[in-house]
Amino acid sequence: MVKNYEEIYGKDELYWGAAPSEIIKRFGELAPVGAALDLGMGEGRDALYLAGLGFSVTGIDATKSGVSKCLELARKKELDVKALSADVRKFKIAKNRYSLIAAINLFQFLPKAEAQKIINSAIAGLKRGGLFVCESFTVDDPHYKAHKKSSKEIAPGTFLDSSGNIYSLYDYGEILKMCCPQFGNTKAQAQLRPVHYAEYDYYDTTHGPAHWHGVVDFVGKKL
């Protein structure tokens, strides 16, 4: 079951902590400083980090409590962050505007077709040389077997649970081909050059009891 993040982010503590995600910390500085977009930003840990690097950041999250917390932290730290409570699927990404677009732990909560639309819009929204950074969960994640047993699989790797929540887990190489279709179809025009791609098991100690995830990371540079 998908957690109630509106309620979680409404608490005083930072659920994910104050430190940025490892992939943003590792690759954020490789993007040319300019406008950045954080899709599904949560409480804004990556948005705040990028603003600290000098980016002018727009963060989008469905939760009002997450947005409120991010804006308060940005005010206290005097950082350039604009945060909006909105459905990322309906947010219109301006073309050729951003130096970096991030979607960290977003795509597991969307049908894969909708994730693909966001990826396509993000690629169009990047300036030449800009970076697209995303992270999600793979079929090696324990949630995959759990959903296979208890949820309805409405598309390969995408499940509808008993509460009506969507959960998607990505097969080997799937995110790479979604971001860089030239790897699945040699006739497809390349728009991103992969900078980093990894699938791995991750022991998560950042929130709640320690647990395992199957993770996929992708970083691509706009050609």
Q: What residue spans do the PLM features occupy?
A:
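Short catalytic micro-motifs in class I SAM-dependent methyltransferases
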Residues: 105-106
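Conserved acidic residues
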Residues: 34, 99
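Class I (Rossmann-like) S-adenosyl-L-methionine-dependent methyltransferase catalytic domain
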Residues: 1-31, 37, 42-92, 110, ...
